């Protein structure tokens, strides 16, 4: 069973519906102990880095998530769920992310319309794994004001541009995390969700 981490920070129903659409066995997870037996974990998120990181601790998800990530099992982070994998964010000095990846999150340079919201194309380093079948230059839906800056640039799996180039996807083993919203990105987003479901053992098919 794929578990979607429900910590009160995201459009979870859309993610759930997207995975159900491609045939995944999936449910919302409000009990952190269920992560230990998951076939895969989806970690969405929207909103404040500080609030979300505090909620993960208060609800008991922080340490089980770290333990799950340390085992290199199928994991998909979405939007704030990508940013929280890193250690820190300029949005909330002093707040701690999960620290699964070394690096921080930076705000777009002054002068841009914030948040970066709408459809934008991505460039991929690889079209293997969760990006299999996704064409170079495909458009995905973004809503964010910050973006990740990994210390290890080899983890970057994709880039996009908003007057400056930024990392929009990372991969490390069975961990994939994206800044865009696959659940809002129509056919290509469903393709990515189907690829994740297959990695988790589901007999999934992109719609």
Where would I find each of the regions flagged by the language model?
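Cysteine-nucleophile active-site neighborhood
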Residues: 47-119
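Short, surface-exposed beta-strand/loop micro-motifs that present aromatic residues
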Residues: 164-171
């Amino acid at each position: 069973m794929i578990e979607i981490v429900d910590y009160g920070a995201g459009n979870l129903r859309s993610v759930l519906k997207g995975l159900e659409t491609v045939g995944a066995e999936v449910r919302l997870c409000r009990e952190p102990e269920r992560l230990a037996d998951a076939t895969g974990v989806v970690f969405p998120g929207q909103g404040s880095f500080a609030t979300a990181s505090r909620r993960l601790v208060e609800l008991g998800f922080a340490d089980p998530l770290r333990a799950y990530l340390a085992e290199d099992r199928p994991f998909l982070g979405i939007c704030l769920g990508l940013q929280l994998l890193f250690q820190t964010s300029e949005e909330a000095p002093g707040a701690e992310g999960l620290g699964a990846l070394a690096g921080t999150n930076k705000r777009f340079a002054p002068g841009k319309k914030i948040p970066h919201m709408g459809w934008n194309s991505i460039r991929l380093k690889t079209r293997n794994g969760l990006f299999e079948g996704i064409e170079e230059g495909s458009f995905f839906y973004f809503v964010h004001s910050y973006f990740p800056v990994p210390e290890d640039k080899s983890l970057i799996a994709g880039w996009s541009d908003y007057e400056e180039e930024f990392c929009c996807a990372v991969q490390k083993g069975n961990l994939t995390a994206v800044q865009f919203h696959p659940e809002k990105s129509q056919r290509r987003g469903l393709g990515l969700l189907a690829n994740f479901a297959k990695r988790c053992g589901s007999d999934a098919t992109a719609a």
